[in-house]
């Protein structure tokens, strides 16, 4: 019961395909839809097989630099098998959220930030344990470090010079700091409080006279509350200090000839629409003020946004939203029970419904039973297992035992490293649009490409097509030779041709040539007339000057090629030389 109970904050496996590895996600919320189903709002984690080849190289470079800086080498004592399996435990965190049906959850796992003080073998020794150190942004395809680094060592630390003898400080102390209040003033606390009450009253009266403030603060109570904020009190205390704590002169400054002084803070400077935008941005980005300013409030300064945030937290609106969020969190689902589902569709079973014990002793829904004889596990090469699973495209006839199949689903790779994995560099992923068209189906799924020798496994030929040139295009080639310049264009295939200039020149030349008559094509005489003319006028044979017999050189004679008795290929029972237009070895003999 507890194994199938999933709560908010758990790291879980999600199955989006019966043949692909599990997705690794962290549950953020559990929401119940209108239809009664449960959806999970999750944070996405990506495997190495999910990102591009370039980013994998950057991640390996970052890991190598981290290993060089650390005192204990990370992969010094690891075998090739352990290094291969360690790559399957590495994940990449993302800030991307998605909603998935809770019924697709297939188990729990554990994901932690890479601990540099802990041995990497601890991740291999624990089941369903993963680690991450970099953050992947799927929108811009970049990798970033998830935590800041404290760089320790002579490379990053400053050289501390020797202590110098004490000298007199020649700096002007008046420029270093400014005194704004004197606690030893001649006024008592009661007199200062009375002056602050006068400053609040002046601020309330100033808001009553200001038209824009009257719109924002329609009632006297709200105007008095706005005048009682810190900016009014700070201005009053600063005015009192600047006038030597003389109450009469300070009050005269608060109420000059032009009218009372009005002091506003960020709460009053912001409009209602700007406040709504700020709350929307805060709901989306949290306290990431740089993103809030960039996407929602670019006309506000960062200082203004931060100041408004801490003032906004003191308002009743913030308290109300906090209570609403607490009530929503209380009403949301805290956990969900997902029962064990039916067997995987890739499971191979015999005709009587019992699981096979030997790979090849049972049949599948894809291949006949005779085609599976002698097939072993593609990962560990075992020939016996209590259950077998079809792996890869059906025409590949690949199978995995129960242990390797579970490893493939959880960790996204084969348990045992293959020779091709050791020799080749990481292949491009399906996310790269330039490489996707050149990858086969099994390569897109991260499976090895195997050549079985069967014509079924060959790549299908694409549908043939041809490009038909229009009549006007053929005319434009002749009319616009100076602009088109076909020879230069052929030598530069990646430089675009200016079709607009060609079209304009063709229109001008076509108007010029439309008035001139076209040259009529000469009609060809029939063959009977040509034969009659040749009979009447036979061709004269040229006089050939023959040399004496002693000066004649032996004429060479080309002999037929000797038959090539090499082995016949499948291509029409002819060898490679015949299919490429070659006659084999030739011998030249003199007559």
UniProtKB/Swiss-Prot annotation:
Keywords of this entry: Cytoplasm, DNA-binding, Metal-binding, Nucleus, Phosphoprotein, Zinc, Zinc-finger
Tissue expression as described in the entry: Expressed in heart, brain, spleen, lung, liver and kidney.
Presence of keyword Membrane: no
Ranges of residues in domain ELM2: 148-258
Compartments, as annotated in UniProt: Nucleus; Cytoplasm
Segments forming domain SANT: 265-317
SUPFAM superfamilies: Homeodomain-like
Example GO biological process: granulosa cell proliferation
Annotated GO CC locations: cytoplasm; nucleoplasm; nucleus; NuRD complex
Domain BAH as annotated: residue spans: 1-147
GO molecular function: chromatin binding; protein-containing complex binding; sequence-specific DNA binding; zinc ion binding
InterPro entries in the cross-refs: BAH_dom, BAH_sf, ELM2_dom, Homeodomain-like_sf, MIER/MTA, MTA1_R1, SANT/Myb, SANT_dom
Principal location class: nucleus
Cited PROSITE patterns: BAH, ELM2, SANT
Modified residues (Phosphoserine): 425, 427, 516
Spans annotated as Disordered: 417-456
Ranges annotated as GATA-type zinc finger: 377-404
Residues bearing the modification Phosphothreonine: 452
Biased composition, class Basic and acidic residues, residue ranges: 421-435
Subunit comment: Component of the nucleosome remodeling and deacetylase (NuRD) repressor complex, composed of core proteins MTA1, MTA2, MTA3, RBBP4, RBBP7, HDAC1, HDAC2, MBD2, MBD3, and peripherally associated proteins CDK2AP1, CDK2AP2, GATAD2A, GATAD2B, CHD3, CHD4 and CHD5. The exact stoichiometry of the NuRD complex is unknown, and some subunits such as MBD2 and MBD3, GATAD2A and GATAD2B, and CHD3, CHD4 and CHD5 define mutually exclusive NuRD complexes. Interacts with BCL6. Interacts with NACC2. Interacts with PWWP2B.
Entry similarity comment: Belongs to the metastasis-associated protein family.
Its biological purpose: Acts as a component of the histone deacetylase NuRD complex which participates in the remodeling of chromatin. Plays a role in maintenance of the normal epithelial architecture through the repression of SNAI1 transcription in a histone deacetylase-dependent manner, and thus the regulation of E-cadherin levels. Contributes to transcriptional repression by BCL6.
Name listed for the protein in its UniProt record: Metastasis-associated protein MTA3
Natural source organism: Mus musculus
């Amino acid at each position: 019961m507890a194994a199938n109970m999933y709560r908010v904050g758990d790291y879980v496996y999600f199955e989006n395909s019966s043949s692909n590895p599990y997705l690794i996600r962290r549950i953020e919320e559990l929401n119940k839809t209108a239809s009664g189903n449960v959806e999970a709002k999750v944070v996405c984690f990506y495997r190495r097989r999910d990102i591009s080849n370039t980013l994998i190289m950057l991640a390996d470079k970052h890991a190598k630099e981290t290993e060089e800086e650390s005192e204990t080498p990370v992969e010094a004592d690891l075998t090739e098998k352990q290094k291969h399996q360690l790559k399957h435990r590495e994940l990449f965190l993302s800030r991307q959220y998605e909603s998935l049906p809770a019924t697709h959850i297939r188990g729990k796992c554990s994901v932690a930030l890479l601990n540099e003080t802990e041995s990497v073998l601890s991740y291999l020794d624990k089941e369903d344990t993963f680690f991450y150190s970099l953050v992947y942004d799927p929108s811009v395809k970049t990798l970033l470090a998830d935590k800041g680094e404290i760089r320790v060592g002579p490379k990053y630390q400053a050289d501390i010079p020797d202590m110098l003898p004490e000298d007199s400080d020649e700096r002007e102390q008046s420029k270093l700091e400014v005194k704004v209040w004197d606690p030893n003033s001649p006024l008592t606390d009661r007199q200062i409080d009375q002056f602050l009450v006068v400053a609040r009253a002046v601020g309330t009266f100033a808001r009553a006279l200001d038209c824009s403030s009257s719109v924002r603060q329609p009632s006297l109570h709200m105007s008095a509350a706005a005048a009682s904020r810190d900016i009014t009190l700070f201005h009053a205390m600063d005015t009192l200090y600047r006038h030597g704590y003389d109450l009469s002169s300070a009050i005269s400054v608060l109420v000059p000839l032009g009218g009372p002084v009005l002091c506003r803070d960020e709460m009053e400077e912001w409009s209602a629409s700007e406040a709504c935008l700020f709350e929307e941005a805060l709901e989306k980005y949290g306290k990431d003020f740089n993103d809030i300013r960039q996407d929602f409030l670019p006309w506000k300064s960062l200082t203004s946004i931060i100041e408004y945030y801490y003032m906004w937290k003191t308002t009743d609106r913030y308290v109300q939203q906090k209570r609403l969020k607490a009530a929503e969190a209380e009403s949301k689902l805290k956990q969900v029970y997902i029962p064990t589902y039916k067997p995987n569709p890739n499971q191979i079973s015999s005709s009587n419904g019992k699981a096979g014990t030997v790979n090849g002793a049972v049949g599948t829904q894809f291949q006949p039973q005779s085609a599976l004889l002698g097939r072993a596990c593609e990962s560990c090469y075992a020939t016996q297992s209590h259950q077998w699973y079809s792996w890869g495209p059906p025409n590949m006839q690949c199978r995995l035992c129960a242990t390797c199949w579970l490893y493939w689903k959880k960790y996204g790779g084969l348990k045992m490293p293959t020779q091709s994995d050791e020799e080749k560099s990481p292949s491009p992923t399906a996310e790269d649009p330039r490489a996707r068209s050149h990858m086969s189906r099994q390569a897109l799924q991260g499976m090895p490409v195997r050549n079985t020798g069967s014509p079924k496994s060959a790549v299908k030929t694409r549908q043939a097509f041809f490009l038909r040139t229009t009549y006007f295009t053929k005319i434009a080639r002749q009319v616009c030779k100076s602009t088109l310049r076909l020879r230069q264009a052929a030598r530069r295939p990646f430089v675009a041709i200016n079709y607009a200039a060609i079209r304009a020149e063709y229109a001008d030349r076509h108007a010029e040539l439309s008035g001139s008559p076209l040259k009529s094509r000469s009609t060809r005489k029939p063959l009977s007339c040509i034969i009659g003319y040749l009979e009447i006028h036979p061709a004269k044979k040229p006089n050939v000057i023959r040399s004496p017999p002693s000066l004649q050189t032996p004429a060479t004679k080309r002999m037929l090629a000797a038959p090539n008795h090499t082995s016949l290929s499948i291509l029409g029972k002819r060898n490679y030389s015949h299919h490429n237009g070659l006659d084999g070895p030739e011998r030249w003999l003199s007559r």
